[in-house]
């Protein structure tokens, strides 16, 4: 909360500083690990699997329990409620009970007097595995028909006739890798037992309500017994939407078993091993187009590496499907989406939430058409834009009317103001005389859906308090 001076001047076009900017730049902003710890606070660490696929034959934790400072060791058998932290499907165990599905999966957890003691103790576990051959790539998953969710197919228009009658056809493949969120503040939760059989969670999360729900399920408690506080995060970008739940659940389970406050903060190496990333995608496509470069038909198969569980892969892939058109009209299109299950960490939300992976492939297709025809890539993009006025070329492949389409006029204005044509010509001249060092220039439009595909998510609430001294307090969700 911050106090801002009252102003009667215009606000549109005026920079408004972030309410915590002065705290950030001065180093006074308090994150979870900066908060004073209550007396008796224990520190947690997780024991991680060292195989990618298999089963636990024997888990010997005697040396872990005997390590100085260790107060509690937690296994899947000790979870009183539901052993699940999956946001949609119940396929994401908090602690693996038998089956190992990726390298770095949690197989037990420890609470100790100090963080160093907890981290040292988890290394003493003696684990015997019955290892199996893992599926580590999308190609291997496709060959084995290994899916976290069933494949999805969509078609609009007469695709085969469009290809049969097209003067030009191309085919190609592409791959875009995953990405680590690399938030500056790692996954961290601090759980404090309170009176009357309740818990207070201080958690670095993008989804406090889901933390409340999943922690209550793991404990077998009611939601009103769990309160969750998130003052600020040191970065999230989607990596703390569903992925923070596992660590909140572990800290809560240990806090209840010990009756002590418990904090878990992952080291960067464990954070990168055990938490999900952006979905990597690979594509195979065929395009049909005319002499002007206008797309007449598109056949596309795209596969995503979802990891070992569904997590948010369903809505991520759905959003990818809804963005394969970007700003362009696709008259005849046949699409197949494969949601690959691999023995890797379960991938999750990341900025754009599947949208960038969809836009990437259509931009790649248009670039190939431009190279084939010897045309400027921007010209090919402009030819394929949705029409400005609603009509036959203004409907997306999934049946939505594109309205208020400013992309054609905006791109034309930007190209003129930045002197695009002259700069492209100068770059071509430079590249012709430079065999090693090359220059480039691109202008790429973006059409991005700002709402959820599930309509009921597109709502929010706010509470406004107007006080007698004229000040205002606004509380809002999200």
What are these regions (language model features)?
Residues 74-105, 147, 210, 228-249, ...:
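Short, surface-exposed loop/turn segments at secondary-structure boundaries that line and modulate
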Residues 46-74, 108-128, 189-258, 315-325, ...:
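Alpha-helical support elements that line or immediately flank enzyme active sites
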Residues 76, 225-231, 259-269, 296-301, ...:
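Beta-strand segments within the central parallel beta-sheet cores of soluble alpha/beta enzyme folds
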Residues 1-154, 169-172, 257:
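Flexible, low-hydrophobicity surface segments
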Residues 80-82, 165-179, 264-271, 438-449:
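Short Pro/Gly-enriched beta-strand edge/turn motifs at strand-loop
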Residues 106, 112-114, 256-308:
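Phosphate/diphosphate-binding loops
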Residues 175-180, 382-465:
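Accessory "access/gating" subregions that flank catalytic or transport cores
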Residues 14, 20-23, 27, 154-189, ...:
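Glycine-rich loop/linker segments at domain edges
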